[in-house]
C-alpha cells in the first residue's frame, strides 16, 4: 500500500520526503491509558513535524492525533491530510489519470476515524469510483459504518474470537458478494484480512482486501 501511494505521488510529480526520525503517533498508548508514553511521543512528533508544512499519512488514527489531539497541548504549524484526500485532490486537479480497468465488483469499508471523527467519506469514494465502475456500498457505510474491531486499542486484545466485531464485518463483506473490499486504514486492512480468510466457505474464492492506494495505482494510465 505504501509503495502504491508513492507510485501515485511520483506519477503526479509530487515532491515528497520521508521523516528520518518517525515515531508512532501514540494513539495506541493513549487508548491503553499509557499517558506518559503518549506525551513523550507527542512531544517528539510535534518538534519534528513543525519543521514542515504538509504531512500526509495513510492512517486515520494518526491524522486524528497529529491534527486534532496534539492541538490540545501544542501549537501545531503543519497541515495533515489523509492519503485518500491527497489522491482525490490529484484526480480533481488532473495530475493523475486512471483507466477504469477493474471490472470486478468493489465495495468500501469506511474506517471509523476517517468517516466519523474526520468527517471524510467523499475522498476515498472519488478515488475508488474512478478505478472501479462496479462499485457498490455495504449496508452499513459512511458515518454509519461498522467498526472493524481494532478501534480503541482492541487490536491488542486477544480473546476466543466469538462475537468479535471484525467477524461481524467480515460476514457482511462476504454476504455482499463483492470481489474486492477496499479500505483506507491499516488497522481495518488487517482486521478485514483476519476476518475474511477464516469465514470464506470452502471452495469459494477469498475476497481480496486492498487499500485505496492499491486500486488507484493498479489502474494508473
What are these regions (language model features)?
Residues 1-221:
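Iron-sulfur cluster-binding electron-transfer modules in prokaryotic oxidoreductases
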